[in-house]
UniProtKB/Swiss-Prot annotation:
Biological process according to GO: negative regulation of endopeptidase activity
Disulfide bond among keywords: yes
Name by which UniProt lists this protein: Bowman-Birk type proteinase inhibitor 4
Superkingdom, taxonomy of origin: Eukaryota
Organismal lineage: Eukaryota, Viridiplantae, Streptophyta, Embryophyta, Tracheophyta
GO molecular function: serine-type endopeptidase inhibitor activity
InterPro entries: Bowman-Birk_prot_inh, Prot_inh_BBI
Amino acid sequence: GDDVKSACCDTCLCTKSNPPICRCVDIRET
């Protein structure tokens, strides 16, 4: 679970919430 969160926040925008919420965008569409 945490590993997925880390990977998500590593490439996506992460909100400064507690717990942090990852807002992933389709970077492949850029």
